[in-house]
């Protein structure tokens, strides 16, 4: 479970995020929709530890991670994947996944984790040996996630 409670974020004198609360249960998929400048990216950057909130809290699996660094959040299984299809074009899908897991301390479950990725994005399983740069834009975004 992931939860944001009464999140407020400022950029200098600008109150960018005003009291957002959000709860996402395991297995749910949630989309943030809004106009340019509405705070979608700021909310995600704050949730992933890339921006500190002014007030409010961020919770993961019942633990307050508000003051946990972005790197530590990655170790907990949480990360921020911005738009832009940032993949290594000259490497295969599998090589991109392996590179993404390179810094993991627990490397014993990589095969199971890759199988989980492939179950969520079956097209990546079909293209695991294909160069990432030849994937469609949507497929590249799946791989980046």
Where are these regions (language model features)?
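Conserved structural motif at the start of ABC-family nucleotide-binding domains
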Residues: 2-4, 17
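Helix-to-loop junction immediately C-terminal to a conserved catalytic motif
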Residues: 48
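Conserved ABC transporter NBD signature motif
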Residues: 56-63, 76, 109-114
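Conserved ABC ATPase signature
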Residues: 131-135
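The feature captures the beta-strand-to-loop junction immediately N-terminal to the Walker
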Residues: 33-35
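Short beta-strand immediately N-terminal to the Walker A/P-loop
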Residues: 30-31, 80
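ABC-type ATPase nucleotide-binding domains, specifically the catalytic core motifs of the NBD
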Residues: 12, 30, 68, 93-112, ...
């Amino acid at each position: 479970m992931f939860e944001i409670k009464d999140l407020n974020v400022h950029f200098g004198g600008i109150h960018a995020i005003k009291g957002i609360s959000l709860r996402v249960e395991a297995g749910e998929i949630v989309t943030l929709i809004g106009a340019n400048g509405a705070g979608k990216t700021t909310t995600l950057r704050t949730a992933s530890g890339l921006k500190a909130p002014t007030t409010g809290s961020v919770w993961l699996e019942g633990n307050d991670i508000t003051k946990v660094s972005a790197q530590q959040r990655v170790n907990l299984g949480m990360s921020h994947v911005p738009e832009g299809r940032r993949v290594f074009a000259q490497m295969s899908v599998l090589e991109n996944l392996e590179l993404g897991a390179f810094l993991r301390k627990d490397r014993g479950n990589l095969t199971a984790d890759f199988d989980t990725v492939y179950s969520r994005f079956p097209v990546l399983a079909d293209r695991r040996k294909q160069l990432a740069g030849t994937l469609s834009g949507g497929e590249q975004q799946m791989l980046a996630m």
